[in-house]
């Protein structure tokens, strides 16, 4: 079954010019890009995005960081795309992330860990709706799919 997930290169990843490398990793894995945009996250969007952390001591820092500069927001499609992208991304704390993962290769500190990826189908749907309008997403038949799955 084709799933969708939300992936965001955070301000530190954008500033460090990692967008192209990150895109390439997902494309080389065989995932299909359905939408992408460079944007600024508003405070309201950040609060919705991090709603589950509201009331926690680090909530303010999360909102401040994600609104501190441009992000690169993306929607990817593929079979088991959430599981696959989370493996490519690596553990939340870059010190625990394996080499070869995005966070393992580029992350230094848990507060600036380069990238966000949805952790469930429910989260993906909620996050996609925060950052994208339906008409900004394009689903199409990937001609390589037969060679991947």
Swiss-Prot record:
GO terms for molecular function: ATP binding; metal ion binding; nucleoside diphosphate kinase activity. Major role in the synthesis of nucleoside triphosphates other than ATP. The ATP gamma phosphate is transferred to the NDP beta phosphate via a ping-pong mechanism, using a phosphorylated active-site intermediate. ATP binds at residues 10, 58, 86, 92, 103, 113. Its main location: cytoplasm. Homotetramer. GO terms for biological process: CTP biosynthetic process; GTP biosynthetic process; UTP biosynthetic process. The active site is at residue 116. It comes from Bacillus subtilis (strain 168). Transmembrane segments: none annotated. This is Nucleoside diphosphate kinase.
